[in-house]
From Swiss-Prot:
The keyword Cell membrane applies. It is found in: Cell membrane. This is Uncharacterized membrane protein MJ0933. PANTHER family: TRANSMEMBRANE PROTEIN 19. It comes from the Archaea. GO terms for cellular component: membrane; plasma membrane. It comes from Methanocaldococcus jannaschii (strain ATCC 43067 / DSM 2661 / JAL-1 / JCM 10045 / NBRC 100440) (Methanococcus jannaschii). Coiled coil: none annotated. NCBIfam families: TIGR00297 family protein (TIGR00297).
Length: 238
């Protein structure tokens, strides 16, 4: 009994220490505001302490990839006033809440929830890649619902380059998921779920965000839900 208690305390201490170090690094990078750092730290602790290091690594992969693509063509984005290098707690919750819920379900023995976790993160990553890289394209964006030409940055607008970038983002998370958890089906489910979530983001953005019915965080949340569900459904049929 004492050994179990000691192991629990050690795991708790190590988890807190790792999360504090990561929080300081994120704070220094200025990628998140103070509330965002706190929120992401809580999420990170839940994943690390209750789910394990592999779960945390996958979420960190999304964060790191997001930071990298946000800084691609930064000067061009600043000139167009489309840069968003510092994100808030709302962004953290919109992209991380659904993955955390799937991770909690996985703790309780729902094996399919791991796929939902990976696929929902893939959806968030895919959307980030499309948004951050798509605006650098010289193509004229088209609204996903009507394919009419619209201004860059319009909610629900897509480009071929941005869509392909989104496919890459989803695939990378699917690949990382496979490398971490060892099931080759994760690549397909994660990629497909990520793409589906990204397209759902554009569709909901065109139908509701443009009209002011939903905001960007609502749309991102819906994208992760769709991505997670699609990934799970595909996994269950394989």
């Amino acid at each position: 009994m004492e050994v179990d208690t000691m192991e629990t305390l050690i795991r708790l201490f190590v988890s807190i220490l790792i999360i504090c170090v990561l929080a300081l690094m994120i704070k220094k990078s200025r990628c998140l505001d103070n509330e965002g750092v706190i929120g992401s730290s809580i999420m990170g602790f839940i994943l690390l302490y209750f789910c394990g290091f592999k779960y945390l690594i996958l979420l960190l992969s999304f964060f790191i990839l997001g930071v990298l693509v946000s800084r691609v063509g930064l000067e061009k984005k600043k000139a167009k006033k489309m840069d968003e290098t510092c994100r808030s707690l709302k962004n953290v919750l919109a992209n991380g809440l659904i993955p955390i819920l799937f991770a909690i379900l996985a703790i309780f023995g729902f094996n399919w929830a791991l796929i939902g976790y990976i696929s929902s993160i893939a959806a968030a990553t895919s959307d980030t890649f499309s948004s951050e890289l798509g605006i650098l394209s010289n193509e004229k964006p088209r609204l996903i619902t009507t394919f009419e030409v619209v201004e860059k940055g319009t909610d629900g607008a897509i480009t071929i380059f941005g869509t392909l970038a989104g496919v890459l983002g989803a695939f990378l998370i699917g690949l990382f998921g496979y490398l971490l958890f060892g099931d080759i089906k994760i690549v397909l489910c994660g990629t497909a779920g990520g793409i589906a979530g990204n397209l759902a983001d554009s569709l909901v953005g065109a139908l509701f965000e443009r009209k002011g019915i939903l905001n960007n965080e609502h749309v991102n949340l819906i994208a992760t839900i769709v991505g997670g569900i699609i990934g799970v459904l595909i996994y269950c049929t394989l």
